C-alpha cells in the first residue's frame, strides 16, 4: 500500500456460485480523489462498490483503506458512508433527525448534533429545513438530505450508488455539480457508480470502465475519450468512425485520402486502425475526389445535426453545427477529417 493510495483492491475476485462477476481486479484510489466506475449493465461495477463497502466479501484478494486491510471487516468497521439511488430516508423522522441519525447512534451530545445538522443543511443549500419531513420536499432535495447525512459523519470514504438516476436532467446537472463541489471541499476519497457517461465525466478525477468483470481502461475523462485503448472503449465512450489506415512519416492515408499525421501518432507501424470522432469531420463544397461523400440521413438535434454520409463504401457519422450548415439527404459534399479528433486503436474489440 503506497502512501498516496487511500483505497486499494488487490487481485480481487468475486464469484456467485460458478459465475465470476469480478475477475482479478486491481484498483487504487489516491487520497481525496473521486473515481467513477462506468460500464454496461452487468459489468460488475455495483459489485465493486459493495465489496469496498463491506456488503460483499471477495472470493479472493484483499481490500485496503487508509493502509489497513479491511477485507474481513463489516461496513460499520470501515468508516464508510454510502449515498444510495433510493435516498433511503426515514419517512417518520424529520430531515434533521434523518441527517443526525448516525451521530445519535454514535452517542454524540444532542446540542452538538443539532449544530452539526444545521451546518450540514447549509452545505447542501437546505438551511432551515431541519423540521420538515421527507414527503414535504422534492426528489432533488431528498438527495441533498441523503448527501448531508453522509457528510455529517466525516467518513474516510464516500460511496455513491447511481445517486442521480431518479432525477430529471436539470436536477442531475445541478446535483452532480454540488456533489463534486463538496467532495473537493472536504477532500473525501470517493467511489462513484453510474451508467451515465456525462455524469461520470463531470464528477471524476478518473473514470474506470469495466466490462464482464474486468477493467477495460482507467484514466481521466479526456484520456478515455481522446485515447481509447480498444474498439470497445472507442465505441463505449461515444460515437466513433473506425477505419484501416496507412501511416507514413508525415501523413495518414485513409481510402486514398491523405491528411497530416497527428503528433501523438508515435507508433512505428505502417498499417493501423484509427478512430475518428464525429465532431472531427466537417463538410464543405470543395475538395478532392477522395473526399467526396453523399448525405444519407439527417437528424436535427437542436444545436447540431447528426449526419450520416456514404463515403468510399463506408457509412460515417458526423456532428455538424446547426448554425454553419443545413444539410439535406442526397446532397453531395467533400469531407475533411481533422487530426485533433483521431486516435490509433492498439487492441481489437475487447467487448
UniProtKB/Swiss-Prot annotation:
Binding sites annotated in the UniProt record for ATP: 39-46
Domain called ABC transporter: residue spans: 7-237
Cellular compartment(s): Cell inner membrane
Gene3D superfamilies for this protein: 2.40.50.100, P-loop containing nucleotide triphosphate hydrolases
Main location: membrane
Coiled coil stretches, renumbered: none
Membrane topology field: Peripheral membrane protein
Keyword Ribonucleoprotein: no
SMART domains, per the entry: AAA
Keywords: ATP-binding, Cell inner membrane, Cell membrane, Ion transport, Iron, Iron transport, Membrane, Nucleotide-binding, Translocase, Transport
GO cellular component, one term: ATP-binding cassette (ABC) transporter complex
Top enzyme category: translocase
Catalysed reactions, semicolon-separated: Fe(3+)(out) + ATP + H2O = Fe(3+)(in) + ADP + phosphate + H(+)
One Pfam family cited in the UniProt record for this chain: TOBE_2
Gene Ontology molecular functions: ABC-type ferric iron transporter activity; ATP binding; ATP hydrolysis activity
Enzyme Commission number, as recorded: 7.2.2.7
Domain of life: Bacteria
Function in brief: Part of the ABC transporter complex FbpABC involved in Fe(3+) ions import. Responsible for energy coupling to the transport system.
Binding partners and assembly: The complex is composed of two ATP-binding proteins (FbpC), two transmembrane proteins (FbpB) and a solute-binding protein (FbpA).
Record family assignment: Belongs to the ABC transporter superfamily. Fe(3+) ion importer (TC 3.A.1.10) family.
The protein's name: Fe(3+) ions import ATP-binding protein FbpC
Species, as recorded: Photorhabdus laumondii subsp. laumondii (strain DSM 15139 / CIP 105565 / TT01)
Gene: fbpC
Amino acid at each position: 500500500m503506497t502512501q498516496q493510495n487511500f483505497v486499494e483492491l488487490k487481485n480481487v475476485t468475486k464469484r456467485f456460485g460458478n459465475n465470476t462477476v469480478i475477475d482479478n481486479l486491481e484498483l487504487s484510489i489516491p487520497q481525496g480523489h473521486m473515481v467513477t466506475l462506468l460500464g454496461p449493465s452487468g459489468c460488475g461495477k455495483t459489485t465493486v462498490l459493495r465489496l469496498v463497502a463491506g456488503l460483499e466479501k471477495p472470493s479472493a484478494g484483499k481490500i485496503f483503506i487508509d493502509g489497513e486491510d479491511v477485507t474481513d471487516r463489516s461496513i460499520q468497521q470501515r468508516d464508510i458512508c454510502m449515498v444510495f439511488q433510493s435516498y433511503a430516508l426515514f419517512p417518520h423522522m424529520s430531515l434533521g433527525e434523518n441527517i443526525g441519525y448516525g451521530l445519535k447512534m454514535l452517542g454524540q451530545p444532542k446540542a452538538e448534533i443539532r449544530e452539526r445538522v444545521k451546518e450540514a443543511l447549509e452545505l447542501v443549500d437546505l438551511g432551515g429545513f431541519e423540521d420538515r419531513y421527507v414527503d414535504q420536499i422534492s426528489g432533488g432535495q431528498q438527495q441533498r438530505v441523503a448527501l448531508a447525512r453522509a457528510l455529517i459523519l466525516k467518513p474516510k470514504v464516500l460511496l455513491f450508488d447511481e445517486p442521480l438516476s431518479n432525477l430529471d436532467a436539470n436536477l442531475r446537472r445541478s446535483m452532480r455539480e454540488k456533489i463534486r463541489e463538496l467532495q473537493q471541499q472536504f477532500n473525501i476519497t470517493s467511489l462513484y457508480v453510474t451508467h451515465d457517461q456525462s455524469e461520470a465525466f463531470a464528477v471524476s478525477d478518473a473514470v474506470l470502465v469495466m466490462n464482464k468483470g474486468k477493467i477495460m481502461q482507467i484514466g481521466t475523462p479526456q484520456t478515455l475519450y481522446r485515447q481509447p485503448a480498444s474498439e470497445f472503449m472507442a465505441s463505449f465512450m461515444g460515437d466513433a468512425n473506425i477505419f484501416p489506415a496507412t501511416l507514413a512519416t508525415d501523413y495518414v492515408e485513409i481510402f486514398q485520402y491523405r491528411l497530416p499525421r497527428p503528433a501523438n501518432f508515435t507508433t512505428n507501424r505502417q498499417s493501423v486502425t484509427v478512430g475518428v470522432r464525429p465532431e472531427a469531420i466537417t463538410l464543405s463544397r470543395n475538395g478532392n475526389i477522395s473526399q467526396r461523400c453523399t448525405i444519407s440521413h439527417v437528424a436535427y438535434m437542436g444545436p447540431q445535426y447528426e449526419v450520416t454520409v456514404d463515403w468510399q463504401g463506408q457509412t460515417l457519422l458526423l456532428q455538424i453545427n446547426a448554425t454553419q450548415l443545413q444539410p439535406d439527404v442526397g446532397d453531395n459534399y467533400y469531407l475533411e477529417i481533422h487530426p485533433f479528433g483521431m486516435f490509433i486503436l492498439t487492441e481489437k474489440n475487447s467487448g
